[in-house]
Amino acid sequence: MSHPVFVRPELVVDNVTVTYNNGHTAIYDASFSLTGGTICALVGVNGSGKSTLFKSIMGLVKPSVGKVELSHKPISHALKQNTIAYVPQTEDVDWNFPVLVEDVVMMGRYGKMNFLRIPSREDKAIVNKSIERVGLTALRSRQIGELSGGQKKRVFLARALAQQGTLLLLDEPFTGVDVKTENAIIELLQSLRDEGHLILVSTHNLGSVPEFCDHVILINQTVLAAGPIETTFTQKNLEMTFGGVLRHINLSGTALHDDNDPRTVTVITDDERPAVFYGHTKNDPPAQSQSKEQNS
């Protein structure tokens, strides 16, 4: 069975402000736009509004001001069409609930079924292909609570694949997984991007952002910067976004070079995978994106 052909979606978040009933404004005047065929990182400190932004895109909270549209239609239309798929944090899931891997993946088809939720032959074929694509065919009849952290992540990726959404939202997909699983997830996301999906990834893993993302949104109650990795994921913008939270390590001069090369290495980390910058100014792109360009 071939992969479905998607019409590339366009996500527009226009001047969105979300104020909760207790009066707390979680995000304000947030604006950006993205098109299909893109992997975009959503980066910010805890409490910066990332979760609220995700909820507004998923229609779980209604903006007090502004609007969210997918492919020039209100987000409510996209929800009715089941075109937004969500991969949650593992901490948000009750792993003691007795359910099989294949049943979790089948949940991605619920929006396509009638109220009796009896899967069709097509539903079963799509679920089989989704499980195969994330490499869990041998574990399809296992209880999900028995799986490792990385395997659980892949189950929910398979559910998102089965849903056949054009917009995928992933909340901290690399937390608690090993390097091999992280690389497998990245490879899958890149293949989905190449098929035309729009993928928005909330992550604290700064070091991996320039390696697999095309765009980045930096948020701290509002969108501080948004654009291509090479021009937006800079030391200057990260310092603006994270304030004093990040730790800096700088190497320059004879500690780094045998000659008079004026460039410096700056390592920025929030105690997860660090971002490395090598250049003259705080506006230079990350070292990872420079090496990616040289290898392409």
UniProtKB/Swiss-Prot annotation:
UniProt KW rRNA-binding keyword: no
GO MF term (any one): ATP binding
Residue ranges of the TM segments: none
Gene3D superfamilies membership: P-loop containing nucleotide triphosphate hydrolases (3.40.50.300)
Keywords recorded for this protein, A-Z: ATP-binding, Cell inner membrane, Cell membrane, Ion transport, Iron, Iron transport, Membrane, Nucleotide-binding, Transport
NCBIfam families found in the cross-reference section: PRK15056.1 (NF011630)
Name recorded for this polypeptide: Chelated iron transport system membrane protein YfeB
Source organism: Yersinia pestis
